[in-house]
Amino acid sequence: MEKQGCEIEALDIDYNIFVRKINVNPFGIFRRKPRPEADQPVKTEEESLKLEDETGNKVKHVLKGVTCRAKPWEILAIVGPSGAGKSSLLEILAARLIPQTGSVYVNKRPVDRANFKKISGYVTQKDTLFPLLTVEETLLFSAKLRLKLPADELRSRVKSLVHELGLEAVATARVGDDSVRGISGGERRRVSIGVEVIHDPKVLILDEPTSGLDSTSALLIIDMLKHMAETRGRTIILTIHQPGFRIVKQFNSVLLLANGSTLKQGSVDQLGVYLRSNGLHPPLHENIVEFAIESIESITKQQRLQESRRAAHVLTPQTTLQEKRSEDSQGESKSGKFTLQQLFQQTRVADVGTMNIATEFTRDFANSRLEETMILTHRFSKNIFRTKELFACRTVQMLGSGIVLGLIFHNLKDDLKGARERVGLFAFILTFLLTSTIEALPIFLQEREILMKETSSGSYRVSSYAVANGLVYLPFLLILAILFSTPVYWLVGLNPSFMAFLHFSLLIWLILYTANSVVVCFSALVPNFIVGNSVISGVMGSFFLFSGYFISNHEIPGYWIFMHYISLFKYPFEGFLINEFSKSNKCLEYGFGKCLVTEEDLLKEERYGEESRWRNVVIMLCFVLLYRFISYVILRCRCSQRSFKTTLA
């Protein structure tokens, strides 16, 4: 018998969200207003109004006492109109959200959220994938991160999954997205499903898997899910908005939601019986699920009428008996066909004999931190070298700008005017290099979405991502530093010492790495590219203002002096000056037959000395580590707060 899934049961689920009427600071991810804990639910309207007075927020009841059950070998479809609470219920079943009241059980035991993420797959409505990786590479990297298997077995599993997903024809094609040409939308959705089933989960949960697809592609997706349920015994739960007639036939069970409440769960035929019991008669060849969704208003009115009659004791004993018989008849058809189907499903479950056995899976990650870092570094490197806008354009930009600057400042004279021009050159180089990496911000924002999705599934640690992200750019930035330093240094005629050239190249490398770290830090913080671009530009401008180039640090007001010491421009700027003018007896200005100003005098005037050469390098490295650490902390906060949902009005 094939591997079996798990029985998922939700009992009396209540879930509330807060609607804020005020503008929310997009950077306030560390500050959250008080919210009710799981053991302190908001149960009544009176309590809701009280909570609104205390916090300034309104409480919206998304789910109200929802109960449902999903079984192995079956597909449970959660249907209902927009705003019915389908996605919220799905995230609760996927252990991504915590309800205020109610419980979720896995194989009749309370769900262990950390463990459940290891044995389940959750496919979001949006395809969050790297567009420049091929289909096979995407699945292979996912397998490496989630499975501890030899390389041959990993490749064999990926090939088998590609065949199961029907993606052999596009296995070597790039995934693509809105801006990168790649595979079709239906194929991309199948890749998203493949990423979540590569570790062979017992439960597969999908949010609107047919959204945005044509009818043929949507049917292919559902047929594939049906095949997974019937051949591998998986428990499959999905939400769907407007299922077609052929799609509905594939569902074993349908959960009808309306206004956050359960109207009915059962087979499609049981749903038809339920509709008729409420006075609705769907046409013979009508799509029953669509008819039920369209008739929700009539159903709720009928239910409210029945509840009011019960409350007023209007029902006669005969009517009560008839309603009870009608409810009992929903569990079976007139011919007994569905009872036989249920017995057949129960027999298959009993054959496996694991329904009442606790699911035991390790909480640990599949790989060590070192292995995760190596895998992620490999994946990052593929993306960098395939991103022409980042790799080729940056390469041409750095080499071209180095040559142009070298020609503009060609062979500067060794006099006071030449010294001033050198200082201006260093200031421009700093401004250019520290502000030219903002174009990488969209790439980091895309990576952040993928990081949050993958870490929420337990694929790897956030710390491994932070280390890999820091390592992968080192060789790339070193190449850029050499391409820029070589022409500008020798064409301008800076310090002819080869060691001075190496130190200059080191400073350029650290400047590029510092700028990269700043962009990484703010990409973890800001909500989008527009805000990120504005914030980074403002921060860099402020740092340049207090660098010491426009105004000496001795003349900066005391209440602003802290900006001078945290400026990213200060230490490399000092490093350039020390590297160029230190240990040099060149005379810059003569008067009355003797030297009036030497290069050493310029350094003494600004109180720069040779002892600061390596101190500045160390401080620049500390800035790199600081911004990388801040980005790691922010990402950890984002990933840990992913389980909470707040609606902004």
From Swiss-Prot:
The keyword Membrane applies. GO terms for molecular function: ABC-type transporter activity; ATP binding; ATP hydrolysis activity. SMART domains: AAA (SM00382). Pfam families: ABC2_membrane, ABC_tran. It comes from the Eukaryota. ATP binds at G80, P81, S82, G83, A84, G85, K86, S87. Residues 308-336 are annotated as: Disordered. GO terms for cellular component: membrane. It is a multi-pass membrane protein. The chain crosses the membrane at residues 390-410, 425-445, 474-494, 506-526, 529-549, 617-637. Keywords: ATP-binding, Membrane, Nucleotide-binding, Transmembrane, Transmembrane helix, Transport. Residues 42-284 form the ABC transporter domain. Signal peptide: none annotated. Belongs to the ABC transporter superfamily. ABCG family. Eye pigment precursor importer (TC 3.A.1.204) subfamily. This is ABC transporter G family member 5. It comes from Arabidopsis thaliana (Mouse-ear cress).
